[in-house]
């Protein structure tokens, strides 16, 4: 009787229990770009640091027809091995990697996959399976049906990791959710937004609620405006066909930047449990109106000023009449007691002057009187590269006068934590999926609320053919009107600080 109750409770908690043994990770789309750049390097990183469950097995599945040796050769090519030790660890990692080829819409293919899984699961007490869908959204529904019908474990836990995009607007997102609902419980679905796995994004809650001096000033009475900025120094460069279908708003802002906004704006959760955190994020989204077109500017990059870099429309995969925005700046408002009237300025663009993702919180002006035009305080969180936090503050310039100077309290992670490795976002998120921790994954109602905010704007831009994005040069800061746009919502730029971020060579970790 007791064992029956225990098994029942375990089934009820299947979505949140940690998978320690008898686990197989199946990478669907194993020959694709995402698996190559992110999934396999992340799995190897977890293996190197001994975070994968004991006896883990990794199965690749894709349409590409290749034998076991060719598959292992590809896996090896995905992972950098700068030392002999890492090369030996990769050899060991490859010993539990296997591959099966098949179609995404054929029962026979998935029956064959299930036979392979059952073969490598022989002797296990349970069949715990994580299906990582590194696939284009066009096959999500078909593959979901096939997995449930032919590959769902008889005795064990099943989880499915789904990559963005989760639709193109509110209706398509709901259609996708309805397609997944018959096959998968919400607790079995892990919707990845890899920005939620980034170290500095995960640090937002600790900074906010673990430091009283931040918590006390985190409101409309002290904060004038918030900027969340995403900049890439490269264009589409041959991948314009995919990007043109979605654009910068769907690709970056509706998901990555909005997720950061919810963490910045949410109230203190009851606990750090996944549901309590996500409940508070949803409350923020429900307090936001749809983005108004008057609070938006869009741009599309042209040639660089020296002519060395091509314009967006010079990409052979991009239609010549494309109106797809490669840059956007917009302002959102949250209608609640804490944030009413505070503009949240989100900016994102390709082919800009630098690689940077940062959060810039600008506080209100110092009460006038003894100071004249003294610069505002700012809290800046650098998400990437060079993960850092610094506070711009006013201080007395050493000497006999009472002259003020802007200085900074600077926490640069690579200096302060030089002996610690900052994990890649995908490593962190795959580990969370193994643990059954949904905190850093997107819930269904959260997804629905986010699309409600963006869909009217997206339809407005899609339907009004006369709206043409402003051209900006490849390698610039964006459209020429950008500074006036941010200033119109209260942002005050001051060069009194003369602050220059330390430039160091860092890998692109997007």
UniProtKB/Swiss-Prot annotation:
Principal EC category: oxidoreductase
A single cellular component GO annotation: cytosol
PROSITE patterns found in the cross-reference section: G6P_DEHYDROGENASE (PS00069)
Entry EC number(s): 1.1.1.49
One Pfam family from the record: G6PD_N
Chemical reaction(s) catalysed: D-glucose 6-phosphate + NADP(+) = 6-phospho-D-glucono-1,5-lactone + NADPH + H(+)
Keywords attached to this entry: Carbohydrate metabolism, Glucose metabolism, NADP, Oxidoreductase
One term of GO molecular function: glucose-6-phosphate dehydrogenase activity
Binding site for D-glucose 6-phosphate: 164, 194-198, 232, 251, 350, 384
Binding site for NADP(+) 1: 29-36, 63, 164
Pathway listed: Carbohydrate degradation; pentose phosphate pathway; D-ribulose 5-phosphate from D-glucose 6-phosphate (oxidative stage): step 1/3
Gene3D superfamilies assigned to the protein according to its UniProt record, in alphabetical order: Dihydrodipicolinate Reductase, domain 2, NAD(P)-binding Rossmann-like Domain
Binding site for NADP(+) 2: 347, 356, 360, 382, 390-392, 410-412, 477
HAMAP family: G6PD
Similarity remark: Belongs to the glucose-6-phosphate dehydrogenase family.
Function as written in the Swiss-Prot or TrEMBL entry: Catalyzes the rate-limiting step of the oxidative pentose-phosphate pathway, which represents a route for the dissimilation of carbohydrates besides glycolysis. The main function of this enzyme is to provide reducing power (NADPH) and pentose phosphates for fatty acid and nucleic acid synthesis.
The name this protein goes by in its record: Glucose-6-phosphate 1-dehydrogenase
Upper taxonomic lineage: Eukaryota, Fungi, Dikarya, Ascomycota, Pezizomycotina
